Amino acid sequence: MLRKIVPAYRAAALRGQVELSCSPYFHPILPLLCDSAAHHHAHPGAPLPEPPFAWPADADAQLARALQAHTAWFGQPPCGVWPSEGSVSEAAASAIARAGFRWMASDQDILARSRA
Protein backbone atom coordinates (compact mmCIF):
# COMPACT_ATOMS: atom_id res chain seq x y z
CA MET A 1 0.00 0.00 0.00
CA LEU A 2 2.70 2.51 0.97
CA ARG A 3 4.49 1.99 -2.37
CA LYS A 4 1.38 3.29 -4.13
CA ILE A 5 1.10 6.60 -2.26
CA VAL A 6 3.87 8.62 -3.92
CA PRO A 7 2.94 7.50 -7.46
CA ALA A 8 -0.73 8.29 -6.77
CA TYR A 9 0.09 11.77 -5.44
CA ARG A 10 2.49 12.36 -8.32
CA ALA A 11 -0.14 11.40 -10.91
CA ALA A 12 -2.83 13.52 -9.26
CA ALA A 13 -0.50 16.54 -9.14
CA LEU A 14 0.56 16.12 -12.76
CA ARG A 15 -3.13 15.96 -13.76
CA GLY A 16 -3.76 19.19 -11.85
CA GLN A 17 -6.13 17.52 -9.37
CA VAL A 18 -4.17 18.48 -6.26
CA GLU A 19 -1.60 21.01 -5.09
CA LEU A 20 1.20 19.47 -3.09
CA SER A 21 3.27 21.16 -0.43
CA CYS A 22 6.52 20.33 1.30
CA SER A 23 8.36 21.30 4.46
CA PRO A 24 11.92 22.60 4.77
CA TYR A 25 14.28 19.70 4.00
CA PHE A 26 15.54 18.69 7.46
CA HIS A 27 12.44 20.11 9.22
CA PRO A 28 14.21 23.11 10.85
CA ILE A 29 12.40 25.99 12.48
CA LEU A 30 13.02 28.58 9.73
CA PRO A 31 12.52 31.72 11.84
CA LEU A 32 15.23 30.51 14.24
CA LEU A 33 17.63 29.76 11.38
CA CYS A 34 17.04 33.24 9.99
CA ASP A 35 17.56 34.92 13.37
CA SER A 36 17.47 33.34 16.82
CA ALA A 37 15.91 36.56 18.17
CA ALA A 38 12.68 35.57 16.36
CA HIS A 39 11.93 33.35 19.36
CA HIS A 40 11.58 36.48 21.50
CA HIS A 41 8.77 37.85 19.29
CA ALA A 42 6.67 34.73 19.74
CA HIS A 43 7.60 34.09 23.38
CA PRO A 44 8.57 37.33 25.17
CA GLY A 45 10.62 36.70 28.27
CA ALA A 46 11.73 33.24 27.19
CA PRO A 47 15.48 32.64 27.34
CA LEU A 48 17.28 33.07 24.03
CA PRO A 49 20.12 30.85 22.83
CA GLU A 50 23.64 31.99 23.63
CA PRO A 51 25.36 33.11 21.60
CA PRO A 52 22.65 34.50 19.33
CA PHE A 53 22.85 33.40 15.71
CA ALA A 54 21.44 34.23 12.29
CA TRP A 55 21.96 31.84 9.38
CA PRO A 56 19.49 32.97 6.69
CA ALA A 57 21.55 31.25 3.98
CA ASP A 58 20.86 27.95 5.76
CA ALA A 59 17.13 28.68 5.61
CA ASP A 60 17.46 29.31 1.87
CA ALA A 61 19.38 26.03 1.48
CA GLN A 62 16.73 24.09 3.42
CA LEU A 63 14.04 25.39 1.08
CA ALA A 64 16.13 24.75 -2.05
CA ARG A 65 16.81 21.14 -1.01
CA ALA A 66 13.13 20.62 -0.23
CA LEU A 67 12.22 21.89 -3.70
CA GLN A 68 14.78 19.58 -5.33
CA ALA A 69 13.65 16.51 -3.41
CA HIS A 70 9.96 17.20 -3.94
CA THR A 71 10.47 17.74 -7.67
CA ALA A 72 12.40 14.48 -7.94
CA TRP A 73 9.67 12.54 -6.12
CA PHE A 74 6.59 14.17 -7.62
CA GLY A 75 7.71 15.35 -11.07
CA GLN A 76 7.10 19.05 -10.43
CA PRO A 77 7.91 21.60 -7.74
CA PRO A 78 5.49 22.03 -4.85
CA CYS A 79 3.04 24.92 -4.89
CA GLY A 80 3.33 25.67 -1.21
CA VAL A 81 5.33 25.07 1.90
CA TRP A 82 4.19 24.07 5.36
CA PRO A 83 6.91 25.43 7.64
CA SER A 84 8.00 23.12 10.44
CA GLU A 85 5.64 23.50 13.39
CA GLY A 86 3.84 26.19 11.35
CA SER A 87 6.55 28.62 12.44
CA VAL A 88 6.75 31.91 10.55
CA SER A 89 8.49 35.26 10.71
CA GLU A 90 9.06 38.11 8.27
CA ALA A 91 12.51 36.72 7.44
CA ALA A 92 11.16 33.19 6.95
CA ALA A 93 8.31 34.46 4.77
CA SER A 94 10.84 36.36 2.64
CA ALA A 95 12.97 33.22 2.26
CA ILE A 96 9.89 31.22 1.27
CA ALA A 97 8.95 33.83 -1.35
CA ARG A 98 12.52 33.96 -2.71
CA ALA A 99 12.46 30.18 -3.11
CA GLY A 100 9.43 30.53 -5.40
CA PHE A 101 6.65 29.09 -3.27
CA ARG A 102 3.21 30.54 -4.00
CA TRP A 103 1.82 30.03 -0.51
CA MET A 104 2.69 28.89 2.99
CA ALA A 105 0.54 27.43 5.74
CA SER A 106 0.41 28.13 9.45
CA ASP A 107 -2.35 28.87 11.95
CA GLN A 108 -3.92 31.98 13.44
CA ASP A 109 -2.33 31.71 16.87
CA ILE A 110 1.17 31.31 15.44
CA LEU A 111 0.61 34.16 12.98
CA ALA A 112 -0.59 36.43 15.78
CA ARG A 113 2.54 35.75 17.85
CA SER A 114 4.96 35.91 14.92
CA ARG A 115 4.46 39.51 13.79
CA ALA A 116 4.63 38.17 10.22
Predicted segment positions?
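Carbohydrate-active enzymes and regulators
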Residues: 1-116
